[in-house]
């Protein structure tokens, strides 16, 4: 349909609306939002400003734009033609003003100068070129009033002048100027899609009312209302901050390996070939090898270990006191074939190898002779001869030994290994027991497999076989399984206090722990136990202001890398303890757990306002900044309710928090003021409309009285002046 037909259609009012204002206030965006239904994001609007003008030819060349120009306002069919202008082309604007029905005067709420120019330049210019056209004042870019200005300024072009918070104009500033000029005032946001219809519908009303005064015979213009009031815009409720848990520390394998090289708090001495002494830790060896686990649980108070047949076994303190017997048959195969035998890492029972011999090619004959010659025996003090119990060990005993780092004598467990075990391959085995890894470039793989056979570490044998078969990639799954199983054993040792070497004295009791595990997973613990402090040489450490539930949660995290909650766990006390121990990852996990609990309580209609107030300042003081941000968000979005229930607590908040509340509270203060003004103005408008209706005459006259009878026509001819006494 040709656009000229709108001018010829009966009862269709064509409205020419000219949009003027300073550069970059949002005129063209506003026109496109109405004419083309264009939607833009805030970042698109913040792109480099290029002066543009929306061509009036769009109504002729684009059918969609023409269709969207048609509207019905107060039962009047209209066709709205929008005219865009440049903000700085003075000569071109006078042609746009010609025969305009209404003028929309725009300014930006983030640019006070644009509002100042409304009074000093734009309104006088409008009245000069089209003195009878009504004017509508529009505040654009409303979304900047509640936006994050720091993010907005970062997204703008580099040389753009930053938007300052004190430059954001409140609604009353625009309303004051509009009242001074005697024109309606509206606000819009293309980003929020707010106020666009209000502006142009009321601009149409203003144009139709102005036209009604000149074309008073058009009856369809009688019911056109004056420009309506605009309800204030309620900004969207800000979403709660998301608790981000950073990646856990990546030194889970490096620290144990370093602990093996630098044996801090070592409690085991492994003697190889009567001359090589290697310091190690019970907790690492026992949680990685079932053989070491049974060895360290052995009762050393009895000097004799069974009879020559090996029927008398060790007496561990747990359920392993009756080990299952495993017998290996002799096969004359190549060493690599031996490595490919089925193996399982989860072998927890000891193996009776008495009277047996290892596979040919992997075990030296001299070592076999030594083992067969040593049946059972006695050691002075607390110790045992282990020849008939395991082919890997010769004896175990407790003795005073010099610490390799502090050079102080203390009680240690000395384990003499079989003479066939060489130091180099044995260190590779120890590295596996500490880290679960075996290097592909390790030498003496056959000796490593031999030691793994003696210690019954069958997964290590499988890793060696994979390397020999060029299938080392399969060792990753074995390493994962190693860590899973050791984690379970470490948790068991923590629960039972097995192999513990330190006791924490807490407010409500004591809890046993293991220094090597603490040192390898916490720098704070490493400094305490490895530095020149009293705690490094004592078995009891006092932890004031700490409960057993919090310390147990910290120990489980340090041992396993996982956070485990319990019913009696106090979230804030755990955050305080984790912050004291310099564990930011645990702090983040506890923050996430706390926020999840608060949100679940909110969904169950439980009042959490009091808890949030308590959490806020504690979280800020103890570096739980994500929890503090969440608490700030909750208080800001429930500000009125919190103030009503806890007025004293809110007044006792720090000045920084109170300033934050005033700046970020929702609904914001300007909205509450606007809502109050809108309600008062609406009541006044209703009262004015009521009084206006009462003043209207009950009887309306037409321009002439149609004669219904001869007498009436005679009366009409007798008094001709009665025909001109009508009221419209």
UniProtKB/Swiss-Prot annotation:
It comes from the Eukaryota. The keyword Zinc-finger does not apply. GO terms for biological process: small GTPase-mediated signal transduction. Autoubiquitinated by RHOBTB2-CUL3-RBX1 ubiquitin ligase complex. Residues 315-324 have a biased composition (Basic and acidic residues). GTP binds at residues 21-28, 84-88, 140-143. SUPFAM superfamilies: P-loop containing nucleoside triphosphate hydrolases (SSF52540), POZ domain (SSF54695). CDD domains: BACK_RHOBTB2 (cd18531), BTB2_POZ_RHOBTB2 (cd18359), RhoBTB (cd01873). Expressed in most tissues, with highest expression in brain. Interacts with HSP90AA1 and HSP90AB1. Forms a complex with CUL3 and RBX1. Interacts (via BTB 1 domain) with CUL3. Interacts with MSI2. Belongs to the small GTPase superfamily. Rho family. This is Rho-related BTB domain-containing protein 2. The gene is Rhobtb2.
């Amino acid at each position: 349909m040709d656009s000229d037909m709108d001018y010829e259609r009966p009862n269709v009012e064509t409205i020419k609306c000219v949009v003027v204002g300073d550069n970059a206030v949002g005129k063209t965006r506003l026109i496109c939002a109405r004419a083309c239904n264009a939607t833009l994001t805030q970042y698109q609007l913040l792109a480099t400003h290029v002066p543009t003008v929306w061509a009036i030819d769009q109504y002729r060349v684009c059918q969609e734009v023409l269709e969207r120009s048609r509207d019905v306002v107060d039962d009047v069919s209209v066709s709205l033609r929008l005219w865009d202008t440049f903000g700085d082309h003075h000569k071109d604007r006078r042609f746009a003003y010609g025969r305009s029905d209404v003028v929309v005067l725009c300014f930006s709420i983030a640019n006070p100068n644009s509002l100042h120019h409304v009074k000093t330049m734009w309104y006088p210019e409008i009245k000069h070129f089209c003195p009878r056209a009504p004017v509508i004042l529009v505040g654009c870019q409303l979304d900047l009033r509640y936006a994050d200005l720091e993010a907005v300024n970062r997204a703008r072009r580099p040389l753009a002048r930053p938007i300052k918070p004190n430059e954001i104009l409140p609604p009353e500033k625009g309303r004051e100027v509009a009242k001074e000029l005697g024109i309606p005032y509206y606000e819009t946001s293309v980003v929020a899609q707010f106020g666009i219809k209000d502006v142009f519908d009321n601009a149409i009303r203003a144009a139709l009312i102005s036209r009604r005064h000149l074309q008073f015979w058009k009856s369809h213009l009688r019911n056109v209302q004056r420009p309506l009031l605009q309800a204030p815009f309620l900004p969207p409720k800000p979403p709660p901050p998301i608790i981000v848990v950073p990646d856990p520390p990546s030194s889970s394998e490096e620290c144990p390996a370093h602990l093996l090289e630098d044996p801090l708090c070592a409690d085991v001495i492994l003697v190889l070939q009567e001359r090589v002494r290697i310091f190690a830790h019970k907790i690492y060896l026992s949680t990685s090898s079932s053989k070491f686990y049974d060895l360290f649980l052995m009762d050393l108070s009895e000097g004799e270990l069974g009879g020559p047949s090996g029927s008398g076994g060790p007496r561990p303190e747990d359920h392993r006191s009756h080990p299952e017997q495993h017998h290996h048959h002799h096969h004359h195969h190549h060493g690599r074939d031996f490595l490919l035998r089925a193996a399982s890492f989860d072998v927890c029972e000891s193996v009776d190898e008495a009277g047996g011999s290892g596979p040919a090619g992997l075990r030296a004959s001299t070592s076999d002779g030594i083992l067969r010659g040593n049946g059972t025996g006695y050691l002075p003090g607390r110790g045992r001869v282990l020849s008939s119990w395991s082919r890997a060990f010769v004896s175990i005993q407790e003795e005073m030994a010099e610490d390799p780092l502090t050079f102080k004598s203390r009680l240690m467990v000395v384990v003499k290994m079989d003479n066939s075990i060489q130091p180099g391959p044995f260190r590779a085995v120890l590295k596996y027991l500490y880290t679960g890894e075996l290097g592909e470039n390790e030498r003496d793989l056959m000796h490593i497999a031999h030691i793994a056979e003696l210690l019954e570490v069958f997964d290590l044998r499988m890793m060696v076989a994979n390397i020999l078969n060029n299938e080392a990639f399969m060792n990753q799954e074995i390493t994962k399984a190693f860590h899973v199983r050791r984690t379970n054993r470490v948790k068991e040792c923590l629960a039972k206090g097995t192999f513990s070497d330190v006791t924490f004295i807490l407010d409500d009791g004591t809890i046993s722990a293991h220094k090597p595990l603490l040192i390898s997973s916490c720098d704070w613990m490493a400094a305490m136990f490895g530095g020149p402090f009293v705690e490094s040489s004592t078995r009891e450490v006092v932890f004031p202001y700490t409960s057993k539930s919090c310390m147990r949660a910290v120990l489980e995290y340090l041992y396993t890398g996982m956070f485990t909650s319990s019913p009696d766990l106090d979230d804030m006390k755990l955050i305080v303890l984790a912050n004291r121990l310099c564990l930011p990852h645990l702090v983040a996990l506890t923050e996430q757990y706390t926020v999840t609990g608060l949100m679940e309580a909110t969904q169950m209609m439980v009042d959490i306002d009091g808890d949030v107030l308590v959490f806020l300042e504690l979280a800020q003081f103890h570096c739980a900044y994500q929890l503090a941000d969440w608490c700030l968000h909750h208080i800001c979005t429930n500000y009125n309710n919190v103030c009503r229930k806890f007025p004293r607590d809110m007044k006792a908040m720090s000045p920084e928090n109170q300033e934050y509340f005033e700046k970020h509270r929702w609904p914001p203060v300007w909205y509450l003021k606007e809502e109050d003004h809108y309600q008062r103005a609406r009541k006044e408008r209703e009262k004015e409309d009521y009084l206006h209706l009462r003043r209207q005459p009950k009887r309306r006259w037409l321009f002439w009285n149609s004669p219904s009878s001869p007498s009436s026509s005679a009366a009409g001819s007798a008094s001709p002046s009665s025909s001109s006494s009508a009221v419209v």
